[in-house]
Regions:
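Long, hydrophobic N-terminal alpha-helical segment
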Residues: 1-28
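Structural motif
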Residues: 6-9, 23-25, 47-55, 82-85, ...
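Gly/Ser/Thr-rich active-site loops/lids in small-molecule metabolic enzymes
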Residues: 24-39
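Glycine-rich loops and low-complexity Gly/Arg-rich segments
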Residues: 32-36, 49-52, 80, 108-110
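Ordered, amphipathic secondary-structure segments that act as subunit-interaction surfaces
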Residues: 45-71
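Glycine-rich, aromatic-bearing surface loops/beta-hairpins
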Residues: 62-122
Length: 122
């Protein structure tokens, strides 16, 4: 049902998925990297935008989250080089409310939330 330019959120265990999601998918026993890889096997990223991937910025709250490196590797392996956008936390929540769906995971890494913009299936 998702169309071109619809977005899907993959949230970590701290993400308020139930209160934000229009459509909620629960994958509590899985981490975000595993789910990200599975989603990208089935859903292409949008090639008509500069940054089809968005992350919740940690605003200097500690070091750059190590999980982001995994995301870059997974995206590159599935889609090639893509730009990532960093979003302020509340702006991320606002955008997530408009997403087609939210996948809630059991991910324990902090600032591990990610938004993917769907491309054209060929």
């Amino acid at each position: 049902e998702m169309g071109h330019s619809d977005e899907i959120v993959i949230g970590d265990g701290n993400f308020p998925a139930a209160s934000i999601a229009q459509r909620l998918v629960r994958l509590d026993g899985h981490g975000v990297p595993e789910v990200l890889d599975a989603v990208l096997k089935l859903m292409p990223l949008d090639t008509y935008v500069d940054a089809p991937v968005a992350l919740m910025d940690n605003n200097g709250d500690g070091d750059r989250p190590a999980v982001w490196d995994k995301y870059e590797e997974i995206v590159k392996a599935n889609e090639g080089d893509k730009n990532f956008e960093l979003m302020e936390r509340f702006a991320f929540y606002d955008r997530a409310r408009k997403a087609y769906a939210v996948i809630a995971t059991g991910e324990t890494a902090v600032y591990a939330n990610i938004i993917l913009k769907k491309g054209v299936v060929k």
